[in-house]
Structure formats: C-alpha cells, structure tokens
Amino acid sequence: MLNIKWIRENQELFDEKLSQRFIEPMSSKIAMLDEEKRKITSLIQEFQHARRVKSKILGNMTSKSSEEFEGLQRDVKHINEKLEELEKDLNNNNELNELLNMLPNIPDDEVPYGIDESMNKLVRTYGEINPNALNKQHFELGTKLNLMDFEQTTKISGARFVTLKGDLAKLERALINFMIDVHTKEFDFFEISPPVLVRDNAMYNAGQLPKFTEESFATTKGYRLIPTAEVSLVNIVADTIISREKLPMRYVAYTQCFRSEAGSSGRDTRGMIRLHQFGKVELVSITTPEESQNEHEYITNASETILQKLNLPYRIMLLCTGDMGFAAKKTYDIEVWLPGQKQYREIASCSNCGDFQARRMKARYKEFGSNDTTLVHTLNASGLPIGRTMVAILESYQNEDGSITIPDVLINYMGGLQKITTYSE
C-alpha cells in the first residue's frame, strides 16, 4: 500500500508516477477522500475528549440527583450517540482504502518508462550462445525419453499439468537440493518449509489481493493456494517489530506453487513453461530502507549464480514501468536461453518492493534503545523455478541420440548419474 502522507505532500509527483504506470491522475480524489476521513477522525477525537472530561466530572459529583448531574448525563448520552454515528461514517467510508488497495507501487527513478516488455532495458548477459546447438524442444525430448507425461496427466488433472518419471523426477529433486544448498551455504539464506495454504489477509499483505483475485486458486474453506512462496515468507514478519541488528533477514523456501494463469489462454500451451502447478525455490529478504538497493543486487546475484553453476546462458533485463509487477518498485528479470525456442525466456524475477508490502502487513524495525519504528523493506527473487530450469537443461544439454547430459554440478546430486537415457517400461 502507498503512503497516504507522501501522496498528500507530493500530489504532482504522485500523478506523474501514476502516469508512468499508465494510470490516470488520482491525487485530487485521494486528497478529497483523505480530508473527509481526517475530519471525521478529528471529530471523533474531540467527542472522545469531551466524554472523558464530562465522565470524570460525573464520577466526582457527590449528588447523583441534582439538575447538573442529570444534565451531564444527557450530555454524555448525546456524545455517545454522535460517536456511534461518526464511527459508523468512518467504517462506511471505505472508498479511500479501496482505491489505495488497487494502486500499484511507485516506480523507482531508475526504472525506464515503457508500455510493455519490448521497452525493457538490457543490463548484462552471461555465457555464449551456440548457433549450431541441437534445437529440439524440452517436451519433445522428455516425451521421447518416456519420462515426461502430458497425455495421461491431462486425463487426471486437465491441461497445464505434467507428470515426471524416473530420472527426470530425480533431476527435479536434485535441482531442489542443489539450489537450496547454494542459497543457504553461499548466500546465508535461512531455510524455511512454509504452508502453501494461506488466508486472504496473507495474500493481501503480499500484494496479491484484491487486485489479482482471479489469478489464484481459492478453496471452499477460506484458504488460497499460494502462487509463490513469497506470500508465506514475507508474512513471517507481519505485525512484528524487529530489532535493527537482526536485519537483513534472508529466507529461502522450496514449495509447490499454484496459478490459474487467467489471461494466458493460448500462450505456452505445450510443455512445462506455464503450468497450473509447479515447484519453485523462492528467496525473500527483509532489510532497512538504506540497504534495500544493495540487497536487491545481492538477491539477484544469488538467483543468477544458479544459472552460472549450471553453465546456462542468460541475460538480465531491467523491467520498464509497464511490465513491472504490482508490488514492485524495481524489478530485474533473468531470462535464460532456450535452444529449442531460439530465444530468451523469463526464468526469474527479482524485485525490490520497498515498504509497499510492509505497510500492508505492519512490519517494522527499531534501533537499539529507541522507541521509534520504521517500516522495513521487502525483496523477493525466484531462486529458481524447478520446471523452467529443467526445460533449460534439457534443451541445452541434449545429445544427438536424444539423451541428456547431466550438468557437472548436479552429478553428485544425481547419485553419480552422468546421462539421462530413454526409459523402457
């Protein structure tokens, strides 16, 4: 959620930042609604003060039957009636919060202006692309190996699901353990095993609700399946005050993730690129405003290190204002090269959300010896999605006979296996 005080004091800049997100000016409307709310709040405080004063006088009066006593009683009764009306007005005046809840984060000054991904800015590339590489797509390879099943899975669950078997299932498990080891041992992230069913308020805190209600799966019991472990991880600090010396707090988790893929009809209908259910290793950092920019580079480096160790070519793009996520103020996308598609495809998003999520979930920190609190900054990064990483490995390490060479760093995790070959039932 955005800072209403900042909006009030920077109305022109606020409208300019909204325009970069292709949203019409809102400062005048927000200022008007805010003024109404503040007036009601001020009146409530005045009546509460008057009630305290009159109640204290009543409590000190010795004669309970005097005309003055009865007059004060009538005054207190009238005040209570007015307070009830005002508090009802305040509770019914939800338009301001509803409006703020639908507004995205303010773009950082470094974020380029642009309407879509075509205007993202290249930051750097890694690795050499082999123009003569074999170019079968992952679903062709996996199906031929008899280790990737879409047809039977569709009968079980419908479209956008997959069943991995044998050595591909083992590769999935190897990737999870490899990624967790890198992030915990080399980058000091603390491993978490969080729930994948969360309440609506946890989704709201992370910026998923109310804007993206249709993009997640809701259960009949008031829970939602997480679209990313970011939801569970950032909520670890919800409604808390953290000691400054404990920051940064860095969390890593592997979970299954669930997305309805609303609006993705016709996109990536074949293969493992866009599924309703997929495994992902997620990174979350909680830090101070002063350190969030450095932490953004740190968490991005943690993500790209996985691709470097797997020797997979990639590039990093700074997302433009029109392509950036709802809760982010600045985002790097890591795009891995897929020989089968002959193009870069997104494999990770690394975002600095500033205090946007923290304001929603009331996550603060304070310096030692001080009573003053400040909102933390939250950051998140994919570290990485298992399915898309497997896609890149299958396409980049394929051989003429359809077998897949295991990347060196994964051989021990695969129990010494160096090549995946066709499975014969």
UniProtKB/Swiss-Prot annotation:
Binding-site residues for ATP, renumbered to this chain: R259, S260, E261, E346, I347, A348, S349
Enzyme class: ligase
Protein name: Serine--tRNA ligase
Keyword Nucleotide-binding: yes
Alphabetical list of PROSITE patterns matching this protein: AA_TRNA_LIGASE_II
PANTHER family: SERINE--TRNA LIGASE (PTHR43697:SF1), SERYL-TRNA SYNTHETASE (PTHR43697)
Domain comment, as recorded: Consists of two distinct domains, a catalytic core and a N-terminal extension that is involved in tRNA binding.
Entry keyword annotation includes Coiled coil: no
One Pfam family named in its UniProt record: Seryl_tRNA_N
Gene Ontology terms: biological process: selenocysteine biosynthetic process; seryl-tRNA aminoacylation
Main subcellular localisation: cytoplasm
Annotated EC: 6.1.1.11
Protein family per UniProt: Belongs to the class-II aminoacyl-tRNA synthetase family. Type-1 seryl-tRNA synthetase subfamily.
Catalytic activity: tRNA(Ser) + L-serine + ATP = L-seryl-tRNA(Ser) + AMP + diphosphate + H(+); tRNA(Sec) + L-serine + ATP = L-seryl-tRNA(Sec) + AMP + diphosphate + H(+)
Record CDD domains: SerRS_core
Organism: Rickettsia canadensis (strain McKiel)
A single cellular component GO annotation: cytoplasm
This protein's encoding gene: serS
Molecular function, one GO term: ATP binding
Function statement: Catalyzes the attachment of serine to tRNA(Ser). Is also able to aminoacylate tRNA(Sec) with serine, to form the misacylated tRNA L-seryl-tRNA(Sec), which will be further converted into selenocysteinyl-tRNA(Sec).
Residues that, per the record, bind L-serine: T228, A229, E230, E282, S382
The entry's keywords: Aminoacyl-tRNA synthetase, ATP-binding, Cytoplasm, Ligase, Nucleotide-binding, Protein biosynthesis
